[in-house]
């Protein structure tokens, strides 16, 4: 069962907690629902076997991934289930026929599947419906960062 540390009872949408168990089927398997987000991303083991409840998770919640798939570097991971990533890009200045470096910070929902997301990790994110005022993307994959290199990285 999920950790009940919120005021409201935490329960996964679409799962009946009072369902009768037939012989040969474990009750734990009936109390969890997970799905495949598609687009070549595998469902993490933690999403299938875990006990967390997150309605904004792309594997166990009611959020669909559609639209853009982007990458970025984690800048901050201080919020609960939300991280800030930095996306670097080059902007062309016609007057000087040169490129200039620019960046954009984005708030991204990070499911409890990815427990050990740290500053400097490279994340792949997918677009979904607006989850809050500033969050419109969900983390789909985490790769460990290279360490201390130059801050600007073009993807």
From Swiss-Prot:
Highest taxon of source: Eukaryota
Family annotation (Gene3D superfamilies): 2.40.50.1000
PANTHER family: 40S RIBOSOMAL PROTEIN S11 FAMILY MEMBER (PTHR10744), 40S RIBOSOMAL PROTEIN S11-RELATED (PTHR10744:SF9)
CDD domains attached to this UniProt entry: Ribosomal_uS17
Cellular component, GO annotation: cytoplasm; cytosolic ribosome; cytosolic small ribosomal subunit; nucleolus
Protein family (similarity comment): Belongs to the universal ribosomal protein uS17 family.
Keyword annotations: Acetylation, Ribonucleoprotein, Ribosomal protein, RNA-binding, rRNA-binding
Record protein name field: Small ribosomal subunit protein uS17
Any Pfam family matching the protein: Ribosomal_S17
Species this protein is from: Drosophila melanogaster
GO molecular function: rRNA binding; structural constituent of ribosome
Gene Ontology biological process terms from the UniProt entry: cytoplasmic translation
Modified residues (N-acetylalanine): 2
